[in-house]
């Protein structure tokens, strides 16, 4: 747990102790396959469902950036003028004296230079991959919204009218605290 400071550490309460949830567990726990009404019986492949989960993660991640969720930010201190970009780096949250070129960051200001950056979400390639880690992603309300988004995206892409469901999901998302 020490490697994941954003995760709950209350080991006396299993419902608040997370080690990760795989795509397969997510599909099962949130009954995604059962919730998708496939009246035209086209079926949804694992790869399609993974793509819908990734789309939902990406949309949620974008909203979390707009809402300035610190849970999806990283912090970096540059002690040298040139450093390799961390694997989870996406972009700085502000305007630090740092430039990105290929896989390197260059500091043109005073050292050491500490700045905050948005992390890149982890996308799923297989059913055994885990959803993004961190307290924000393991909020049950957020996982329910991601599940509803997956169902809505899957059904919309197969021609079902999901306008009301998407409006409902959007309304609930607006109620979540920052």
Map each language-model feature to its residues.
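Glycine-enriched, solvent-exposed interface loops adjoining structured elements
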Residues: 2-178
């Amino acid at each position: 747990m020490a490697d994941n400071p954003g995760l709950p550490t209350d080991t006396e309460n299993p419902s608040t102790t997370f080690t990760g949830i795989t795509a397969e567990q997510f599909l099962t726990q949130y009954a995604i396959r059962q919730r998708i009404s496939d009246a035209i019986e086209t079926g949804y492949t694992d790869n399609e469902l993974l793509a819908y989960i990734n789309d939902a993660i990406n949309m949620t991640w974008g909203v979390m950036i707009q809402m300035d969720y610190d849970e999806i930010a990283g912090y970096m201190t540059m002690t040298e003028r040139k450093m390799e970009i961390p694997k989870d780096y996406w972009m700085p949250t502000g305007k630090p004296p740092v430039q990105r070129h290929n896989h390197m960051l260059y500091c043109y200001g005073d050292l050491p230079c500490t700045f905050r950056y948005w992390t890149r979400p982890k996308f799923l390639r297989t059913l055994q991959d885990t959803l993004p880690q961190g307290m924000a992603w393991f909020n049950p309300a957020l996982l329910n919204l991601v599940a509803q988004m997956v169902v809505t995206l899957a059904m919309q892409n197969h021609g079902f009218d999901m306008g009301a469901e998407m409006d409902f999901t959007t309304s609930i998302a607006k109620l979540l605290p920052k």
